[in-house]
């Protein structure tokens, strides 16, 4: 059996701010890095904080 040490699964927490200054959180569980790239690219509001946690 071959062991794969590359884990491509992350929980993402983002603090966003809209054009009116309202801040809100979004949570996304179990995203691959490719999914995160799409999410990041499609986020219209400003990202204030970003946290990626590797799923073990």
Swiss-Prot record:
Keywords, comma-separated and alphabetical: Early protein, Host-virus interaction
InterPro entries per record: P56, UDG_Inhib_phi29likevirus
Oligomeric and partner information: Homodimer. Interacts with host UDG; this interaction inhibits the uracil-DNA glycosylase.
Protein name per UniProt: Protein p56
The family this protein is said to belong to: Belongs to the phi29likevirus protein p56 family.
One of the GO biological process terms: biological process involved in interaction with host
Signal peptide as annotated in the record: none
Keyword Oxidoreductase annotated: no
Gene3D superfamilies linked to this entry: 6.20.250.30
Native organism: Bacillus phage phi29 (Bacteriophage phi-29)
Chain's role: Inhibits the host uracil-DNA glycosylase (UDG), an enzyme which removes uracil residues from DNA by the base excision repair. Interacts with host uracil-DNA glycosylase and prevents the latter from binding to DNA. Since the viral DNA polymerase efficiently incorporates dUMP into DNA, the virus needs to prevent the deleterious effect caused by host UDG when it eliminates uracil residues present in the viral genome.
């Amino acid at each position: 059996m071959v062991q794969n040490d590359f884990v491509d699964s992350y929980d993402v927490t983002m603090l966003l701010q809209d054009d009116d200054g309202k801040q809100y959180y979004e949570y996304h569980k179990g995203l691959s890095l490719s999914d995160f790239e799409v999410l990041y690219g499609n986020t219209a509001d400003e990202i204030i904080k970003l946290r990626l946690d590797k799923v073990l």
